[in-house]
Amino acid sequence: MKPLFAALSVAFLLGTSVSVHAAEQAKPTDRSVQVYKKADLAEWNRENAAGGKGPLLGRFAFNRHQTGAQDAFREIGWLTLPPGASIGEHKHTDNEDVYIIVSGKGLFTDSTGKQTQVGAGDITIARPGQSHALKNTGKEPLVFLDLIAETAAAKSASQQK
């Protein structure tokens, strides 16, 4: 119960909402699993993610609250931004965040403020110390795969600051 309370408290403090499947999210990742079937992915939706606008719809194999120090990949999931929705600019201090755009069109903003149109097949990355944002600029949902990885070197560097 404590992990669920902690997850909901963090979501409240960050101004986001977590779907009713949050209890599933608190379970540690079963490290013997090597295939995550789409039907079994846990739903985790947020409103106004990182100060963005509108819903961010997610289905995750696992998230950072379920992984341990031994895991490089901290989060893997399918994300969808409906038309007009966005993920606000946010900084990654001790991990890398990769978006692999599957369908739709969007505007990616990097840590320098440079904006780039992205679409199916494009890949974006925010490395430790970099920020990024993404907005759906099209008329169709913007669907992308989200991969967050953490390295010991990145974590060590962020803790030394």
Model-derived segments and their meaning:
Residues 1-4:
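Positively charged n-region of N-terminal signal peptides that target proteins for export
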Residues 7-17:
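Bacterial N-terminal signal peptides
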Residues 20-73, 155-161:
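A short, N-terminal "cap"/entry segment at the start of jelly-roll beta-barrel domains
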Residues 60-65, 75-92, 128:
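Conserved short histidine dyad/triad with adjacent acidic residue
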Residues 78-82, 91-108:
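Short, conserved beta-strand element in jelly-roll/cupin
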Residues 89, 108-109, 126, 132-138:
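Short beta-strand His + acidic residue motifs that chelate non-heme Fe in jelly-roll/DSBH
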Residues 113-128:
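Short acidic-glycine-tyrosine-enriched beta hairpin
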Residues 125, 139-155:
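A short hydrophobic beta-strand segment most commonly corresponding to one strand
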